[in-house]
Design a protein with these regions (language model features):
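N-terminal and secondary-structure boundary signal
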Residues: 1-293, 297, 303-308, 312-317, ...
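Extended, alpha-helix-rich binding/interface surfaces that flank or overlap catalytic cores
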Residues: 326-327
Length: 353
């Protein structure tokens, strides 16, 4: 990581004495580091230490799923509380805080006050796939500056991948990070961001341009920037560089970074269908989440996370109402038991092959 920052001009370029900086990891859920779901605490620890060494005033903050229950367990299980205790920095939950109204593209959003109060955000995403946005990277990680129920509301309002990605880019535009460092030591492919397959990648990606970082992360996964809505839309708005020809890659050659046989989410076959054709093909190409009763432990996290409340709990397992499901895959994100499986139409199965 220090090598990456040296090539960007050093830590002093991004942190100065007395500067208030918020470290924003990917704390998707209360899963331990070995699950590969959250930014590894060793990465968070290294960043916090470097920022403090530069004289900055540091806090760690995020808004995970099911945060309304309280985030104390999240801090403990992810290892972030141990980091905060070691360096005597604050852990900031965005739940229950005052929200600040912001307008982007004539759409209104409510951002947690602590995010606005800090002079800069140090963004620490993890290299993972995402069932809705394909890639959850530096741009998508900033979606976490919204308090929990605000995120759920946007999932409900914008269930389609491109529309939801547009909202994600709106939120990113409100508070672009001053630096993004992606934890790609162990990546996740398949049906991420909560229940994919872990892959050894051995990468730390860093950039002052979060959009360019995501463009490079896409190459790692075998994706062009225009295949990831958040990267394409953010680049089109001028929020960063999404043109690979204009991105200078340091430390590795382009041909070295792709991961062989990297699996994209099953839902990618549906996401590739243009919005104008999606309704026409909806009965032919579909991916539908289902709860595997044999794996479900009835923890209730999917019930709480569902933005349209189409999941109910029975005596044996959670059950999804297929008629009401909007295929946002929030249930898959938060399930700690890998109990959410993806049923696929015949044509979808053929396309995935």
């Amino acid at each position: 990581m220090d090598d990456a920052l040296f090539m960007l001009g050093g830590w002093e370029r991004f942190a100065s004495r007395g500067q208030r900086l918020l470290v924003k990891p990917n704390m998707l859920s209360d899963r331990p580091p070995e699950a590969g779901v959250t930014t590894h605490p060793t990465v968070v620890e290294a960043v916090v230490q470097r920022l403090i060494d530069a004289g900055a005033q540091v806090a760690i903050g995020d808004s995970p799923s099911n945060a309304h229950r309280g985030v104390q367990r999240h801090w403990e299980v992810t290892g972030y509380k141990k980091v905060a205790t070691k360096f005597q920095v604050d852990l900031v939950s965005f739940e229950g805080q005052t929200s600040v109204r912001k307008s982007v593209q004539d759409r209104e959003y409510f951002v947690a006050q602590p995010v606005i109060n800090n002079e800069g955000v140090i963004n620490l995403p993890r290299l993972k796939t995402h069932n809705l946005t394909i890639l959850t990277g530096a741009v998508k990680n900033m979606f976490g500056i919204l308090p929990g129920f605000r995120k759920s509301d946007l999932h409900r309002k914008f269930p389609k991948p491109e529309a939801f990605s547009r909202a994600v880019v709106d939120v990113f535009e409100i508070k672009p990070p001053v630096l993004s460092i992606m934890d790609g030591v162990i990546a996740m492919d398949g049906n991420g961001p909560g229940n994919g397959r872990l892959r050894k990648a051995g990468l730390i990606l860093a950039s002052a341009d979060a959009v360019a970082l995501d463009a490079v992360a896409g190459v790692v996964m075998g994706l062009a920037p225009n295949q990831v809505h958040t990267t394409r839309l953010a680049g089109k708005r001028g929020l960063g560089n999404a043109d690979l020809d204009r991105i200078e890659l340091r430390g590795m050659a382009w041909e070295e970074i792709p991961i062989r046989d990297f699996r994209l989410p099953d839902s990618n076959v549906v996401n590739r269908v243009p919005e104008g054709l999606s309704r026409l093909l909806a009965t032919l190409v579909w991916i539908q989440p289902r709860i595997d009763a044999n794996s479900c432990t009835r923890c209730g996290k999917c019930v709480e996370a569902c933005p349209v409340k189409c999941i109910s709990m029975t005596r044996t397992s959670a059950v999804i109402d297929k008629d009401e499901c909007i295929q946002c895959y929030c249930c898959s994100e938060v399930c700690p038991d890998n109990a959410v499986v993806m049923d696929r139409s015949l044509l979808a199965r053929m396309m995935i092959r």
